[in-house]
Structures are given as structure tokens and as C-alpha cells.
């Protein structure tokens, strides 16, 4: 079996998983598939590794739990949530978070992923290179124009590691759904078909996605129909997810100190307090459920029973159950309710029947989160939408890495749908007169296969160098707002493709392809005008930074 792994590169935690055992019969049918979430080292109990990097005053770096334990040392800088910093271009924001021209988000990410991959290879005695690393990324990275470059940057970062042969990105909800599909078949002995709603609530993000699962021969195929979300992947900061909830609990508990919220968070002892509260939330899930089960919702904030005690400046401070409810109602409940409402509106508007509702991510294990989700969908006794899903709730936080591992081994396939409209357009440098879309949003993509511009009769459209059309890029369902290369970006694109004047009997064929990570490649062929199937020269250019290429032009055209 190849050295393939799935990586959940999370905002707050990261998990590596692999297929420990894979048995097939003589026809190739999978008869046994055993997944394993990999521990980062001997003696470590959890596969979940803190997505933290600490730069010490001597410029050396510490990672994960070591970084957490060393937080607050004089002259040190703690980097967290760095995955989402890939989309940040504001120098002031980057500087405020400790980034410099030397220690960029890209470098911190590379150092962190290099560390966890090497630990995995050492712990599990992996000889040779990693054949394929499939990484779960937020679904919004496939949808929101300002985060599109995050995919190419992350893929390039991991691909640059000399021991990684191939990198593929997949949306986190699709990966979680892949794990559910595999788990369903394992427990029920038949394949699942239908609509699955994935609610992924982690430490930094909320991602809600409606997935469609279909049979494809012996295997299953997953596609994402609709999504919405909140948190670091939406607003650009951790404000609507598990980390913010824990921070709010600590601030409430330490309010008797007289310190402000910012003073508490910036105190070097804060992260140890937060870590102890987080551990208590995981260890006392049954106590939380038993306490809140018998109290009306509107009375929960007034519960003074102690949940846990934290130590700050050598003094104990009580965390009450009422504080848990108050923090939840302030930080989590409003936005979770809003986003669940948005998804329900979509489901009802399109008359969609949801067959399964699955909660993944560590924060979905919290009782109040579970209760709010169930209330939103009016869960009743014996509700089949919530049953036969992921029976062991401890596996929820590993679902994305498990699904990525299954996709890495091609046990579950992912139906690739174009997240945007792509094509060519006619016009001048200052005006796009008409757009010709050759790939439409929602089209099923044959990955890495170029689609060329066609005439209405189905024949190939041929171009001469002086009449090369603009490249059109569009995220709008209505196609009313096109974004096209023009001026300097157009010149750069023509230069990259090496478009030049041709002989009188030659013409260009132009096309576009998308890879499995939905990264765009432009293609050219030089053909004989009298025999378009006769190709004299081919070339292509991968648009690694499409947002940077389009840049201000997008904003200008949409104003």
C-alpha cells in the first residue's frame, strides 16, 4: 500500500490519519478498511496536535504542545490561526500578529507542516517519500474570491517539501462526508445514497455544508451542493467558534481580578487557563449534559454550581455552569442560529430532503451546541436523520482527516464541480463587451483535461495573436458581473502563455482546465488553419495566484 495520508490542517488543531489496513477481494472490492488517527510521538495520548508555533527570542521555533507550554516567555511570539493568514494582505494586520518579511504566514505554515509530517514519518517508521498528502481545507476556499489564492499557496507550500510527492486539497465538509459514507457502509453493510448536512464546528471556524452522495459502481461519490459559515474563515478573525467560547469563559471567571478582557488574554498565564478549561470541557461532557438537561434554557445562566476551578496568579477562580451558558449565549448561539437558519432557508426553498445530519469538529461535542442544532431541525424521538451517523462521538474531531485518508486511497471519490465561471471574452483593454463561458459554475470537471473554446456548431474557435480574447473569471451565479484580464494583467497573461504573431496559415486554440484542487490552468495550441487537428506547438500556464492577477481590477469592475 502506498504511503498516502489525510491531513486535517485545522485552525486550532491538526490531525494526520491513514489507512492502517486495506483488504480487497480478487475483483478489487474493498472487504476491510481500518482507519487510524496517528499519534505525533511515543507517549502522546491524542492525535490532535495544537496548530501553534512559538518563535523564541533566539528565533528558534517550537510547535504544538511545546509552543503552548512556552507561551508568555519574554521576547517570544505565538502564532495561531496562521492557516487563515494566507489570505491576509494588510501589512498592519500581519505586523500586529507578529509576522515579518522573514517570518511570513507561508514560512510559519511550512515549518509547522514540516514538523508534524516528519514526526509522523519518524513515529511510524515511514521509509521513502509520502506518495500523496490530501489536505482538508475550508469549503469557502473554493467559493470566496479573496481566499482562492489560499489553495494555491498551501498546495505550493506542501509540494515544496522534498519528501512529499503529490498534494491534493479537498473541502473539509466533503472529507467529513466521505468518512460518514465509509462508516455508514461499514456499520450497515450497504451504501448510503442521499443528502447529508455536515455541520463542522471547530476551534476557529463554523462550516455548514449540504452534500450529495451518489453511488458510482462499487464506490461512492461526494459533491458539495451549498455551504455557509462563520468564524476565522469568514470574518478574518477567531470570533464565532470554540476558541472564542473558551476565551469568554476564562474572562468571565477572572473578572473578579479587575483586569480587562484584553489584559486577561494578553497575560502570559492566560493560555494555561484556557487549556485547563478546554480539557475540563472534554472530560466532563456527561456532567454538563446532566446539569443543563434539567434546567430551562432561560435559567441556565444563573446556575452557580461550580463546573471547574482555574488558577491565576496563585489564586483559585471558580468557573460555574452559569458562566458556560453565558459565554455560549454571547459568543456561539447567535451566529450558529443565524447560519443554521440560512441553510434551512436554502433547503426549504429548493424542497430538499435531508437524509442525515452530522456534526463534526471538536466543538460539536459540546452539549449546548448539540442541543441548538437538534432544536433547529426539530429533532424528535427516533429521528433517523441523526441516527446511524458517527456513533462514536470521539471520532467527530477526526472525521476530516479520516475522510481525507479515504480520498487519498481513492476509496471514496469526490465529484469535482467548478466553483466559478471561466472562459474568454471579446472587448478592448477598457471594456469587456461579451463573455463566452466554456466552463460554468457547477459543471462536473474532468480534472486536468483542458476545455477549448468552441463555435456554436461545435467546431474549435481559432484565434490570431492580435485578436486574442480577454480571460474571464466570474463567481456570480447571475453572470451579470464579469471580471476579465485587461491592461497590465492582460499583458502578463499573454506574456506567460507566450502568445506571439503567427504565420498566415497558423492559428491559436485556447482552453482552460482545473485540477483536483480547482486551480486554473490556461492552455494554448498552435494549429494549421486548414487542419485544426494538426497541433504544432502546445503550452500552458498555471494561475497560481489568480486573485493577485485580477486584484484591484475585480473591485474596480464591481464598484
Label each residue range with its predicted role.
Residues 161-175, 373-403:
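Conserved phosphate-binding/catalytic loops in two-lobed NTP-binding clefts
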Residues 95-121, 311-347, 452-453, 462-465, ...:
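Adenine-nucleotide phosphate-binding core of ATP-dependent small-molecule kinases
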Residues 133-150, 331, 351-376, 392-397:
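Glycine-rich phosphate-binding loops at beta-strand->alpha-helix junctions
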Residues 26-156, 161, 241-298, 549-559:
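Phosphate-binding loop and its immediate beta->loop->alpha context
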Residues 2-26, 184-224, 508-525:
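Gly/Thr-rich phosphate-binding beta-strand-loop-beta motif of the actin/hexokinase/Hsp70
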Residues 68-69, 73-76, 86, 234-372:
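Gly/charged contiguous loops adjacent to phosphate- or pyrophosphate-bearing nucleotide/cofactor binding elements
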Residues 1, 167-199, 398-413:
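Conserved phosphate-binding catalytic cores of ATP/NTP-utilizing and phosphoryl-transfer enzymes
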Residues 11, 261-262, 383-499:
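Acidic, glycine/GT-rich loop-and beta-edge segments that sit at the periphery of enzyme/chaperone cores
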